[in-house]
């Protein structure tokens, strides 16, 4: 069972540690990469030995974060997870399981965090883990340099859909304002993160749009990409994350589903919902999780089986009495 920590307590433990390994989640997004990189540079500012490790390759769009990736050059004494809600999200690549089996510290904003770490700083009201990381770094006594600000802004902006998602709060905007004051390159980052799409990404979107299907009297929209189609386009898997917003953007749709076949044949399913429909409840019943309006899971089997399984849970959720989510 994990022991909860305050921001101050987490900062103190990090200041007292050394030889620190920072773990990101598999299929890394801007929040986990941004948090991991920001913490890395904060620890280096305190003359700590640190590195970042992820089971998957960091997407090219986040290469500017430029944190040192762990190559086994030291024996970690403290393992810190950032933006990782459960053990199953660490992945199997790059030797991660050797270190993820015992995590000392966790900084996260997923309300469904499984409590796998010895000590956890958790705030489910934060729109991004980067909001928490900003407070931790300040409490560590480290200046927010322009580069640290860039890393943190990446986390905040990407996890909120450039401040459009419902989890965005006044505090989210306040943190972003502080990062801009610290020298964050906001225009360049917004262009890179939201306004620049590789040709391969556009081709994948074209294929996915051609697969658009409606279910449950138009209340659910679904798109999918098979492994062959993903490989055919040559798209970076990280660039497919943006596709998840397509189905839910359609007028009248309450649940948007995006299915992407993984290298092993399973289907990774992203669930996005309109207000009042709990995406996390849908995903959780299939072994996944996430947030109220954005969640996901992974299912074994062929495309039709994956569709049938997720659609059954969507129907159950849509037909259940709803509360504001």
Predicted regions and their residues:
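Short, motif-level signal for alpha-helix interfacial/capping segments enriched in acidic residues
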Residues: 2, 6-9, 85, 136-139
């Amino acid at each position: 069972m994990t022991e909860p920590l305050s921001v101050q307590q987490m900062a103190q433990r990090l200041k007292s540690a050394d030889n620190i390994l920072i773990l990101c989640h598999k299929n890394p997004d801007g929040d986990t990469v941004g948090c991991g990189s920001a913490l890395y540079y904060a620890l280096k500012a305190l003359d700590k030995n640190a590195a970042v490790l992820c089971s998957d390759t960091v997407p090219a769009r986040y290469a500017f974060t430029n944190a040192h990736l762990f190559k086994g050059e030291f024996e970690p004494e403290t393992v810190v997870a950032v933006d990782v809600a459960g053990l199953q999200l660490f992945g199997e690549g790059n030797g991660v399981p050797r270190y993820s089996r015992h995590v000392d510290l966790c900084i996260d904003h997923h309300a469904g965090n499984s409590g796998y770490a010895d000590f956890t700083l958790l705030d489910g009201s934060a729109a991004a883990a980067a909001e928490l990381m900003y407070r931790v770094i300040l409490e560590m006594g480290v200046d927010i340099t322009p580069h640290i600000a860039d890393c943190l802004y990446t986390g905040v902006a990407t996890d909120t859909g450039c401040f459009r998602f419902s989890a965005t709060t006044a505090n989210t905007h306040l943190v972003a304002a502080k990062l801009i004051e610290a020298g964050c390159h906001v225009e360049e980052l917004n262009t890179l993160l939201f306004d620049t799409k590789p040709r391969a990404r556009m081709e994948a979107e074209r294929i996915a749009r051609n697969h658009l299907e409606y279910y449950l009297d138009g209340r659910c929209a679904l798109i999918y990409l098979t492994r062959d189609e993903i490989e055919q386009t040559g798209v970076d898997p990280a660039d497919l994350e943006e596709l998840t917003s397509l189905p839910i953007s359609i007028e009248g749709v309450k649940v948007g589903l995006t299915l992407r076949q993984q290298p092993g044949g399973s289907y990774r399913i992203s669930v996005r919902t309109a207000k009042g429909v709990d995406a996390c409840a849908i995903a959780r019943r299939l072994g996944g999780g996430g947030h109220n309006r954005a969640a996901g899971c992974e299912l074994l089997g062929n495309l039709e089986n994956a569709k049938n399984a997720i659609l059954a849970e969507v129907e159950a959720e849509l037909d259940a009495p709803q509360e504001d989510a």
